[in-house]
């Protein structure tokens, strides 16, 4: 009875030990024929009562967020600790079971004789315990393998995370580099567009400037031709003035002697004198009156350049400058002798006034050209300030230097013309003073009728020597030479202009 009670107690203890792991494992061992069941999806751990909602399943891979990864690592560490604790508990339970089995075997050995019938049942129970032990060992091995696999997965996830971060950094750098490259290309494109617009504006301005310069050159060519025509007219006018002045001097001397003779002679001679010279026909032009055209000269020769075609044109068109003084004035010689002073002033004054007008026109044209050059100087300075490239700036500075040199030459020409104008005015005032002196001497000779003819001849000779027509002609020729050199300089400067 005692043995039966001991066996019953041991059986109940063994059944309680077997029942505890069956509860802790969550009904994993259900029956000997089907010892395994499906793992519950809402229970992530084996030996814990932690539950998870079925709508939020568990994933083996970590999330992309670092916090989620760290939380997963913590959970894994907790799981590992729990598994270690469970493994220790399982080993302890196995040890206790082994001790119990040893004790049970001892009890069985002692009670072999008594419990021969229960031998098969005990062997069955032993086999079941052995199978349970093998299953527990297999589960432990499987858990160890899962733990190692999870460690490898964590390492692989860390490596993938670092590689992804490196790729993101490299992609960000490439994107920034591409953006900077595109920005630089856009800035270069903007600069090229601005340069193209500037070049088109400069080209349009240059074309406009070229058109203006072509029109200016055309106008200056016409002005040069006009100046040549004026210079030729001025040359012919000066020579005609010289001839008229010489003729006037000779006529003054002859009329002074004739007047004294008339006072001594009879009055009918005056009537015959009017009949001979009252109505003068048109003066037939003789080439002897134009020494610079025909090649002969009554005075010392001068290297005077003359436009023969212009002179022939004046001859064909009845130029009053080349006609005789009596025909030009259309007054008889008797009336001319009575009014010497007034007629001499009128005969000398128009050529000098025409010369002054020509010089003033030349001076005006030179001043206009100088003003245009100053305007071009301002335009060039503006272009130099606005020029984008250094090469264009250097070219414009060279043009500006050439323009400054031309302006200096033009200023010298203006000073020369003003000097010539002042010289001509001085000569005209000197001529007027000499004519006034001649008039006074002729009036004194007319009033002093008691003087002899010898005295009149000597006074007339003295007056003739005082006037010195040869020197005046030389001065006029010198002035003509200066005008021609000025004309040549104007032509050369007009031809050499380049912008």
Curated annotation (Swiss-Prot):
GO molecular function, one term: gamma-tubulin binding
Region centrosome localization domain (CLD), residue ranges: 58-239
GO CC aspect terms: centriolar satellite; centrosome; cytoplasm; cytosol; Golgi apparatus; microtubule; nucleus
Coiled coil: 63-242, 388-491
Basic and acidic residues bias locations: 427-443, 460-474
Compositionally biased intervals (Low complexity): 1-16, 448-458
Region (Disordered): 1-41, 255-275, 424-476
Principal cellular location given in the protein's record: nucleus
Keywords tagged on the record: Coiled coil, Cytoplasm, Cytoskeleton, Microtubule, Nucleus, Phosphoprotein
Any Gene Ontology biological process: spermatid development
Compositional bias segments (type: Polar residues): 22-35
Residues with the Phosphoserine modification: 53
Segments of this protein annotated with the region Mediates interaction with microtubules: 278-490
Domain of life assignment: Eukaryota
Tissue localization of expression: Ubiquitous (at protein level).
Cellular compartments annotated: Nucleus; Cytoplasm; Cytoplasm, Cytoskeleton, Microtubule organizing center, Centrosome
Family (UniProt): Belongs to the translokin family.
Record comment regarding domains: The C-terminal region mediates the interaction with microtubules and is able to nucleate and bundles microtubules in vitro. The centrosome localization domain (CLD) region mediates the localization to centrosomes and homooligomerization.
Subunit structure: Homodimer and homooligomer. Interacts with FGF2 and RAP80. Does not interact with FGF1 or FGF2 isoform 24 kDa. Interacts with microtubules.
Role played: Centrosomal protein which may be required for microtubule attachment to centrosomes. May act by forming ring-like structures around microtubules. Mediates nuclear translocation and mitogenic activity of the internalized growth factor FGF2.
Protein name according to UniProt: Centrosomal protein of 57 kDa
Organism, as annotated: Rattus norvegicus
Gene for this chain: Cep57
């Amino acid at each position: 009875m005692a043995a039966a009670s001991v066996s019953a107690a041991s059986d109940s203890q063994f059944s309680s030990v077997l029942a505890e792991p069956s509860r802790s494992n969550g009904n994993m061992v259900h029956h000997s024929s089907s010892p395994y069941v499906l793992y519950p999806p809402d229970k992530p751990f084996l030996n814990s009562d932690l539950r998870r909602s079925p709508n939020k399943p568990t994933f083996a891979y970590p999330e992309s967020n670092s916090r989620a990864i760290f939380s997963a690592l913590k959970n894994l560490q907790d799981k590992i600790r729990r598994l270690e604790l469970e493994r220790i508990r399982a080993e302890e339970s196995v040890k206790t079971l082994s001790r119990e089995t040893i004790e049970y075997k001892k009890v069985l050995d002692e009670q072999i004789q008594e419990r021969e019938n229960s031998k098969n049942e005990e062997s069955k129970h032993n086999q079941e315990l052995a199978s349970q032990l093998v299953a527990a060992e297999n589960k432990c091995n499987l858990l160890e393998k899962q733990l190692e696999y999870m460690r490898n997965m964590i390492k692989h996830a860390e490596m993938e995370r670092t590689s992804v971060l490196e790729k993101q950094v490299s992609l960000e750098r490439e994107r920034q580099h591409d953006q900077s490259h595109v920005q630089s290309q856009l800035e270069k494109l903007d600069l090229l567009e601005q340069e193209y617009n500037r070049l088109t504006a400069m080209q349009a301005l240059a074309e406009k400037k070229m058109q203006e310069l072509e029109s200016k050159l055309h106008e200056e060519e016409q002005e040069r031709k006009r100046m040549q025509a004026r210079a030729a007219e001025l040359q012919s006018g000066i020579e005609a003035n010289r001839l008229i002045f010489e003729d006037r001097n000779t006529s003054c001397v002859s009329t002074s002697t004739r007047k004294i003779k008339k006072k001594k002679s009879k009055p009918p001679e005056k009537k015959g004198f009017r009949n001979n010279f009252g109505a003068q026909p048109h003066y037939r032009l003789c080439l002897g009156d134009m020494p610079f055209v025909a090649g002969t000269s009554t005075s010392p020769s001068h290297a005077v350049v003359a436009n023969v075609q212009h002179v022939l044109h004046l001859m064909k068109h009845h130029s009053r400058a080349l006609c005789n003084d009596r025909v030009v004035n259309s007054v008889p010689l008797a009336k001319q002798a009575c009014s010497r002073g007034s007629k001499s002033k009128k005969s000398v004054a128009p050529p000098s006034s025409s010369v002054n007008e020509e010089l003033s026109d030349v001076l005006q044209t030179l001043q206009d050209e100088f003003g245009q050059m100053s305007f071009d100087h301002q335009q060039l300075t503006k272009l130099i300030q606005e020029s984008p490239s250094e090469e264009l700036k250097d070219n414009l500075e060279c043009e500006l230097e050439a323009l400054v040199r031309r302006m200096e030459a033009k200023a010298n020409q203006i000073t020369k013309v003003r000097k010539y104008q002042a010289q001509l005015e001085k000569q005209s005032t000197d001529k007027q003073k000499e004519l006034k002196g001649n008039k006074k001497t002729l009036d004194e000779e007319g009033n002093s009728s008691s003087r002899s003819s010898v005295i009149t001849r000597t006074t007339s000779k003295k007056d003739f020597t005082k006037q010195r027509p040869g020197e005046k002609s030389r001065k006029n020729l010198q002035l003509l030479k200066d005008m021609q050199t000025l004309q040549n300089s104007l032509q050369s400067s007009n031809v050499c202009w380049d912008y």
